[in-house]
């Protein structure tokens, strides 16, 4: 299956994300350098998605390029099924994470990066994403869909913070 958007890999660089898409970028401090390795394991194991309330089925236990995943969630009476594939993995000494891109059937069309970064004596988590409506109902639901996306982003960050605190 092909990705549902042409800018595959664009989340690698903030400046190369498409200007005509809804763009999200949020960072949060998790703690000192001691939480870096556990945070990386949590993120690569799809912990942010699970911690935000998504049921995640993935073809590998940890994110690697080509991993296929399906996320499922309920938002009130609405059930969402969101297939995606890992586009790339970052595995550097002080930066680790992955980005996934949407596949046919996903309500949105775009890419999302989940990154853990050690900066001096602090560990940070960052989410960087761009998206456009991918289905008729996300086009129709415009502002509500953006609100749900914003809530999901905060829930991802909350899940990472809770995990870093030992929860």
Please give the residue ranges for each predicted region.
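Long, compositionally biased interface segments
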Residues: 148-167
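Hydrophobic side chains in beta-strands
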Residues: 28-30, 71-73, 88, 118, ...
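Short, intrinsically disordered, mixed-charge
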Residues: 40-48, 105, 121, 158, ...
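Short amphipathic alpha-helical segments
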Residues: 31-34, 38, 144, 148, ...
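Hydrophobic ligand-binding cavity/cleft-lining segments
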Residues: 1-76
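Beta-strand/loop substructures that line and gate deep hydrophobic ligand-binding cavities in soluble
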Residues: 102-147
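General beta-strand recognition
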Residues: 70, 97-99, 124-126
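Hydrophobic-ligand binding "helix-grip"
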Residues: 75-120
């Amino acid at each position: 299956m092909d990705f549902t958007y042409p800018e595959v890999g664009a989340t690698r660089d903030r400046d190369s994300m498409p200007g005509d898409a809804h763009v999200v970028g949020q960072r949060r401090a998790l703690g000192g350098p001691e939480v870096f390795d556990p945070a990386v394991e949590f993120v690569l194991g799809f912990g942010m998605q699970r911690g935000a309330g998504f049921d995640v089925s993935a073809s590998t236990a940890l994110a690697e390029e080509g991993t296929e995943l399906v996320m499922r969630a309920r938002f009130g009476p609405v059930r969402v099924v969101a297939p995606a594939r890992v586009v790339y993995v970052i595995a550097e000494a002080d930066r680790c994470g992955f980005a996934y891109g949407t596949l046919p059937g996903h309500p949105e069309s775009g890419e999302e990066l989940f990154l853990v970064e050690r900066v001096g004596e602090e560990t940070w988590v960052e989410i960087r994403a761009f998206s456009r409506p991918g289905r008729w109902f996300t086009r129709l639901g415009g502002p509500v869909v953006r609100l749900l996306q914003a809530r999901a982003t905060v829930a991802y960050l909350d899940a990472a913070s809770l995990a870093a605190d030992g929860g």
